[in-house]
Amino acid sequence: MKALLASLLESSLNSFQKLSLTHCYAIKCGSISDIYVSNRILDSYIKFGFLGYANMLFDEMPKRDSVSWNTMISGYTSCGKLEDAWCLFTCMKRSGSDVDGYSFSRLLKGIASVKRFDLGEQVHGLVIKGGYECNVYVGSSLVDMYAKCERVEDAFEAFKEISEPNSVSWNALIAGFVQVRDIKTAFWLLGLMEMKAAVTMDAGTFAPLLTLLDDPMFCNLLKQVHAKVLKLGLQHEITICNAMISSYADCGSVSDAKRVFDGLGGSKDLISWNSMIAGFSKHELKESAFELFIQMQRHWVETDIYTYTGLLSACSGEEHQIFGKSLHGMVIKKGLEQVTSATNALISMYIQFPTGTMEDALSLFESLKSKDLISWNSIITGFAQKGLSEDAVKFFSYLRSSEIKVDDYAFSALLRSCSDLATLQLGQQIHALATKSGFVSNEFVISSLIVMYSKCGIIESARKCFQQISSKHSTVAWNAMILGYAQHGLGQVSLDLFSQMCNQNVKLDHVTFTAILTACSHTGLIQEGLELLNLMEPVYKIQPRMEHYAAAVDLLGRAGLVNKAKELIESMPLNPDPMVLKTFLGVCRACGEIEMATQVANHLLEIEPEDHFTYVSLSHMYSDLKKWEEKASVKKMMKERGVKKVPGWSWIEIRNQVKAFNAEDRSNPLCQDIYMMIKDLTQEMQWLDSDNGVDADSLHA
């Protein structure tokens, strides 16, 4: 009879219905009283995830042994019900059943999953009392528990108590030091493990270590790890390869990531595809990301939420709007529109569209039922980026009144709005709120405060914020301070700060050079600026981007060196983008190089026929030259092409209220009196400065 039941249970492993029938048969024939049979059925219920049925059977069992108790404890911990598992463990001890190594291991696994260090210490005491601290399975579980609770010193002590640590013990300890990002100790342990002939390194050893190597400075170390993986013949382990794809992409070596990806052949899983797409997107290789997605479709690879979030982050340019909207349709078709991370990615995508408005992003935000902090931060940042600073402030207030706790990112976005509005009083209030909320030492909040005070004209307060930062190696804070001095015409101070940055080994990035080139441009430090541009790649290992060339063109233009600016553009390794050309157009116009300006403008109209900037620049240039027919021709062209000038807005803070207005705004009921006052002020300014030869056309209210 026992053999028949064993056979029936074996055939029930993949069918809950068969398991139920086998259970009924065991009751009917009286075999359910056999503890072996009961334990087998109990274990099967647990494996199917039917904890309720398992619990009823456990309560009805006339006899229970340690296997019965351990099976139920394992079931509760697997379902995340640690309190029930702990209660059952206590009952097990009281019942007189033997608590063994398996009991401790299963309980410690549950404690590790929820990081209940307090319970872990109690169990450790019982382990010592029971004499199991040298047991490799219990010891490994203790190491894992302490490691996941980020108590790596305790994990190391527990590890040293194990008489013969195995791969699981070593992997748990290494993973603990990975979790606290102690790269030095983690790799030291890897070296020790490598010297142990009896211990085998596997995917559990390398996969966590690879997650640490997420910066270009670790590229050589990553290649060493890759060599070890090849030496051990683990190059086809999917977990290791997926981690390696992500690490190579994070280190900036996308070609190596693609090589690992291609080496997987037909054994790629969904994580492999998603990791490669994310790597391409991160490094602005958008077309490669889209092509890989198309390959996924050809290979009938099922997509998931991570596929779409990786792709949506690449749909930021105007040329990718159609593809981005198609992805939006796929997200809806998949039924993922109420998945918060998917909607957050869609909100960010619509915000980043250059010609887009906030309407689509706001509609998505409002339709999302379970908004998280990223949702709020995205919409606040979107308003700030689009210049809708009042809306950013309003939504920050809504966030504060919700149950979600405000973080440093929200404060940074709001302070950016204050910077754009140049509302000092509001900025100071947010500064006080950030201090009260404990974010005043955060590098991103500090950087935003530096920008805000700089734009509000209080460079001394910006400097005080910079001096208060806890991390003296914060690149974003140094960049903000350099740019702040640049905006105040203190180029030499910016250069001194740049030198300090280099001497203190603060990491330089693209923004650093944009800031320092801007500083040189604003203060006429031509030689210094050009020298820095030329040294970027050979000395600082940073390849110049379009924004750096645009800053250098502006630098030469401000000095009246139009031909030098033209030569610089012609010597660029890549074709100049619209940003560089628009900068050069401004230079030509300011220096009176009308013919050259017209050529640049015509080229811009070919590549960006819908952008209003070029039309407006041409119109103003012809107006300055009093060429009214040409100006009328530009206006006509705009009308025919449906191009409208985006009005520029200005703000002023009066009695704690922000007033917004644009050029020739007549919506204010007092506009007649306002324009009369402007006229009187303009006439008075002309009269006062007539001796200095100030051109009336240069006076703007």
Swiss-Prot record:
Covalent S-S links between cysteines: none
PPR repeat extents: 34-64, 65-99, 100-134, 135-165, 166-200, 202-236, 237-267, 269-303, 304-338, 339-371, 372-406, 407-441, 442-472, 474-508, 509-539, 545-575
Pfam families: E_motif, PPR, PPR_2
Region annotated Type E motif, chain positions: 580-655
Gene3D superfamilies (UniProt xref): Tetratricopeptide repeat domain
Chain segments carrying region Type E(+) motif: 656-686
Cross-referenced InterPro entries: E_motif, Pentatricopeptide_rpt, PPR_At4g14850-like_plant, TPR-like_helical_dom_sf
Keywords for this protein: Repeat
Protein family: Belongs to the PPR family. PCMP-E subfamily.
GO biological process: RNA modification
Gene Ontology MF terms: RNA binding
Annotated protein name in UniProt: Putative pentatricopeptide repeat-containing protein At3g25970
Gene: PCMP-E46
